[in-house]
Regions:
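Short, small-residue-biased leader/transition segments that mark boundaries at the very start
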Residues: 1-13
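Solvent-exposed, non-transmembrane regions of membrane-associated and secreted proteins
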Residues: 11-274
Length: 274
């Protein structure tokens, strides 16, 4: 019995050690990628812009994402949220839809995965709703910090999400933060991930209305047919098969802080008593 206990204990230590090594490895990988993106952006802003690399007949690659795209052609953008650990490349593998659930940016197997876009979403067109998944890791990495948005006070100071595609800088304003269950026919289940392109104004309005039925708090922000959305999704552990979801609408395509500020200030004005 003692020998068995020792063996079990040793195995647990090895697993803990492996998990620690994996966490450090992934942190280093994504820190390096973030540094590369930041350095490229700063260099491009401070000097004469380098010759741009075409992405399509109409569009050029953003200089800060060009090197990453050359490293991995599955890259579709970069997502970041102020005062969180969310600062990651975003991937999409259409032929292997959930590939990045268990693979990192370098395509090596990883429990941490890498944020990725649902396979039926078109980032460049774009679809009416881009669904982006990320793990909720216990060390606070990937999309774990979406938990912060359960607190209205945090949302009040962080109303926008930056999601730059390969060709465009884009800012999104948060419409709703909620949790729901998936993989069930329960009446309280909301299959938000099935909404990608609105077939009609009514379909879009129905999706927004459902988002507005479930939130932790009222943001005072809504969306209308023609708006482009992103939906961030991660695991939520208050019940089985629960998901934490953040839905936001695009407010600018050039990363303009003024537009984001204007929307945030308008929402703040709506909250103030007359």
């Amino acid at each position: 019995y003692e020998i068995s206990a020792c063996l079990v204990g040793s195995e647990m230590c090895i697993r803990d050690s492996d998990h620690y090594k994996e966490a450090n490895k992934q942190a280093e990988l994504y820190d390096e990628l973030a540094d590369l993106v930041d350095t490229a952006a700063q260099t491009n802003a401070a000097t004469e812009p380098a010759e741009q690399i075409p992405y399509s007949e109409e569009k050029m690659l953003l200089p800060e994402l060009a090197e990453l795209y050359q490293q991995n052609g599955d890259l579709v953008g970069w997502i970041s949220i102020a005062d969180t650990n969310i600062n990651y490349p975003v991937m999409q593998s259409v032929n292997e839809p959930n590939f990045y659930l268990k693979h990192g940016f370098d395509k090596a197997y990883s429990d941490y995965g890498c944020p990725y876009v649902q396979e039926d979403c078109d980032v460049q067109e774009p679809s009416d709703n881009l669904v982006i998944y990320g793990h909720h890791m216990s060390n606070g990495s990937m999309f774990a910090h979406l938990e912060k948005f359960k607190d209205k006070g945090f949302w009040n100071e962080h109303r926008t999400i930056t999601f730059n595609t390969l060709t465009d800088k884009q800012e999104y304003e948060i419409v709703a933060v909620f949790r729901t269950v998936v993989y069930t026919d329960s009446p309280d289940a909301f299959k938000y991930y099935r909404f990608v392109d609105a077939e009609s104004t009514d379909a879009f309005d129905d999706f927004i209305a459902k988002c507005k039925e479930l939130p932790f708090y009222d943001t005072g922000v809504t969306a209308e047919y023609g708006d482009k959305l992103i939906t961030l999704s991660t695991c939520e552990y208050s019940r089985n098969n629960s998901r934490l979801v953040v839905v936001a609408k695009r407010i600018t395509e050039d990363g303009g802080a003024d537009a984001a500020k204007t929307h945030a200030e308008a929402a703040a004005e709506n909250e103030r008593p007359n």
